[in-house]
């Protein structure tokens, strides 16, 4: 099975997952790695642990930054949040329609992983861009947080904020442009129109002027093909959120007029909202972008022993959701 469980005799982790990780019973709690000689070994962290060493060599990765939040205003139709930037060495496409990047070549040292949070939700006039996700050490990768949706504080007025993927433009002061995407990480946000805010850009496609968010990147590095870093839908449009965790826009006159947030650990953008005229609702607000994620897996065999104690410690503290066993959903570090 793909479930961690305890050895009843020694009280130590007996099986990590179905790929052949096994742990020896006894005081050491150590594990023989890659018993079945599979092609990839998955490694993941959820709650800031420090893990034992892994063998030097190639490591495939997916890095996704946090998505931007949507715009909000009492009189305009604001833009949606853009998806976070994406860089990956796995599959056929990286962010911004760039080719996949080379795998990391691990040298001896410590590598720190930081997961970017999504831009925060807001019932005021300011959208918030997402935060960067990074891998740092002897190798360095930085994905830029998604741009916030256009609002009355952006310059020129109503333009989407730049980011990994750009936020959608508002209809304030005409049809404001969407924000730009980071080269080789994501696309621009959609332009606002007379009837709606622009959709947020996604890592795989741009946002559109009808409020449709751009799709994210489709990647199966976790073992399940999933979209990441989709753009959100702009306010009041007929468009939908992009695939990859993007939130949807809301009319502030609806009850409640709260937009939908980007999905956690997807890097999706947050939806936009407004309070139009006599339909004002105190509950109306834009929503947050989704937090980012990092997924890594080591290619080929690992040599020697891999200490599983930290995995078990995370599990017993309730910090290791089974569904996320390949994912790094918070900050952490590993050594090589």
Label each region the model flagged.
Residues 17, 24-26, 107, 188, ...:
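A structural detector for beta-sheet-dominated domains
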Residues 1-2, 129, 299, 324, ...:
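Alpha-helix initiation/capping motif
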Residues 308-336:
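Intrinsically disordered, compositionally biased repeat/linker segments
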Residues 3, 13, 23, 34, ...:
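Intrinsically disordered, low-complexity regions enriched in polar/acidic and amide residues
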Residues 1-51:
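Charged, alpha-helix-forming regions
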């Amino acid at each position: 099975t793909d479930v961690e469980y305890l050895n009843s005799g020694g009280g130590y982790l007996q099986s990590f997952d179905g790929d052949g990780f096994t742990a020896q019973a006894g005081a050491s709690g150590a594990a023989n790695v890659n018993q079945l000689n599979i092609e990839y070994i998955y490694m993941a962290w959820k709650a800031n642990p420090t893990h034992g060493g892994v063998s030097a060599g190639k490591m495939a990765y997916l890095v996704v930054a946090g998505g931007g939040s949507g715009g909000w205003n009492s009189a305009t139709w604001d833009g949606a949040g853009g998806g976070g930037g994406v860089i990956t060495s796995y599959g056929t496409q990286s962010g911004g329609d760039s080719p996949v990047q080379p795998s990391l070549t691990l040298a001896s040292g410590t590598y720190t992983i930081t997961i970017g949070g999504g831009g925060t939700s807001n019932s005021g006039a300011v959208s918030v861009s997402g935060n960067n996700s990074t891998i740092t050490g002897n190798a360095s990768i930085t994905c830029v947080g998604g741009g916030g949706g256009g609002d009355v504080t952006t310059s020129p007025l109503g333009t989407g904020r730049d980011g990994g993927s750009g936020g959608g433009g508002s209809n304030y002061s005409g049809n404001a442009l969407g924000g730009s995407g980071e080269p080789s990480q994501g696309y621009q946000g959609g332009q606002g129109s007379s009837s709606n805010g622009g959709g947020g850009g996604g890592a795989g496609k741009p946002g559109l002027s009808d409020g449709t968010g751009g799709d994210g990147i489709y990647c199966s590095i976790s073992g399940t093909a999933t979209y990441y870093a989709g753009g959100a839908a702009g306010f009041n449009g007929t468009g939908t959120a992009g695939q990859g965790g993007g939130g949807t826009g809301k009319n502030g006159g609806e009850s409640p007029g709260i937009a939908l947030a980007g999905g956690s650990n997807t890097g999706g953008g947050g939806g936009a909202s407004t309070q139009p005229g006599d339909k004002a609702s105190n509950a109306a607000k834009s929503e947050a972008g989704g937090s980012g994620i990092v997924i890594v897996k080591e290619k080929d065999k690992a040599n020697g022993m891999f200490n599983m104690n930290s995995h078990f410690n995370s599990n017993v503290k309730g910090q290791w959701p089974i569904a996320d066993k390949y994912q790094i959903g918070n900050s952490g570090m590993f050594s090589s």
